[in-house]
Amino acid sequence: MSRIGKMPISLSNQAKIEISDANVKVTGPKGTLEQALVAQVTLQEENGVVTVQRVDETKKSKAMHGLYRMLISNMVEGVTKGFTRKLEIAGVGYRAELKNDLLALTLGYSHMIYFKAPDSIKIEVPDQTTILISGIDKALVGQVAAKIRSFRKPEPYRGKGIKYEGEVIRRKEGKAAGK
């Protein structure tokens, strides 16, 4: 049995879950999330605890069991607490600022890069070298953070670029001087 899939999901008193045949809907103080279900898994809710079970023992069912348990767990956490990713900008002259609802990035190119986040994602810029991305959908928060990071990935020689908080950049030695 899947070690992740067999763990129950406890609902806080703030989160409500609605289970139908084809999808599951989780509602909380921060918003509502919906997820389509596959035929290989079934959900049961009793006394504020949701359990995910698979219908048979095929390889596909075993794979879906753990996946859907984590997806639903992330939905519950998202509508109650929310998710945040922090990006750090390193480099001379590299900076970020918020102009209306656009994120304006100066990253050493000949032009500025403007990024508009999806409606459910909130972007904050506490200072010029820090970007905070928050929302209720964990996958979407990560996707937006990865998209912003892709504008200037950290390079290994000087470490300039956009990196996740706590990310360690493997540094390389420059060319050795020849004779």
UniProtKB/Swiss-Prot annotation:
GO terms for cellular component: cytosolic large ribosomal subunit. GO terms for biological process: cytoplasmic translation. GO terms for molecular function: rRNA binding; structural constituent of ribosome. Keywords: Ribonucleoprotein, Ribosomal protein, RNA-binding, rRNA-binding. It comes from the Bacteria. Gene3D superfamilies: Ribosomal protein L6, alpha-beta domain. This protein binds to the 23S rRNA, and is important in its secondary structure. It is located near the subunit interface in the base of the L7/L12 stalk, and near the tRNA binding site of the peptidyltransferase center. Belongs to the universal ribosomal protein uL6 family. NCBIfam families: L6_bact. Part of the 50S ribosomal subunit. This is Large ribosomal subunit protein uL6. It comes from Chlorobium limicola (strain DSM 245 / NBRC 103803 / 6330). The gene is rplF.
